[in-house]
């Protein structure tokens, strides 16, 4: 199985599930190794950035740890993107009538010709971050769930969260 962190470079491995701009929500099936169409977002909604997961991790909801990749172009489902964590949102989501921790992590791709990408969540434009927060809240509400954001954190805390979620 692909590790969460590249053994040579230490870069975070991210597998893309859903491309930026898509209304389709794709999910990876570990049993078959295939991606399947799991949801259609309501009219007028689309993923603001590509969404994926970190392999060899397990979040509190039983799935691999989710990440949103801050990158201008849509990325194809199934591709591996060497990435750097820039932070996350402390969040809780309703699941089976109970509120459970379900933080959101953010990454940027590591590219040789990078144009000075953000290194910390606070480097993002405040309006952009507000729009991303609104996306998560609205998306969950339209799926019949409640989503609450309780703060933000930087790359160090994000890396600790990933390390705690590594499958043993």
Question: Which role does the model predict for each range below?
Answer:
Residues 1-168:
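Hydrophobic N-terminal alpha-helices or hydrophobic patches in metabolic proteins across all domains
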């Amino acid at each position: 199985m692909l590790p969460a962190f590249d053994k040579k470079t230490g870069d975070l491995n991210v597998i893309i599930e859903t491309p930026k701009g898509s209304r389709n929500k794709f999910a990876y099936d570990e049993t078959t190794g295939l991606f399947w169409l799991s949801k259609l977002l309501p009219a007028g909604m689309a993923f603001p950035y590509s969404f994926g997961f970190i392999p060899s991790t397990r979040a509190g909801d039983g799935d691999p740890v989710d990440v949103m990749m801050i990158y201008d172009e849509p990325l194809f489902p199934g591709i591996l993107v060497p990435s750097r964590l820039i932070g996350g949102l402390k969040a809780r989501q309703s699941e089976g009538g109970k509120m459970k921790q379900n933080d959101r992590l953010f990454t940027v791709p590591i590219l040789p010709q990078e144009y000075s990408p953000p290194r910390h969540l606070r480097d993002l434009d405040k309006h952009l971050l507000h729009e991303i927060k609104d996306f998560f809240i609205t998306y969950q509400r339209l799926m019949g769930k409640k989503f609450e954001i309780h703060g933000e954190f930087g790359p160090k805390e994000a890396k600790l969260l990933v390390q705690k979620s590594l499958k043993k």
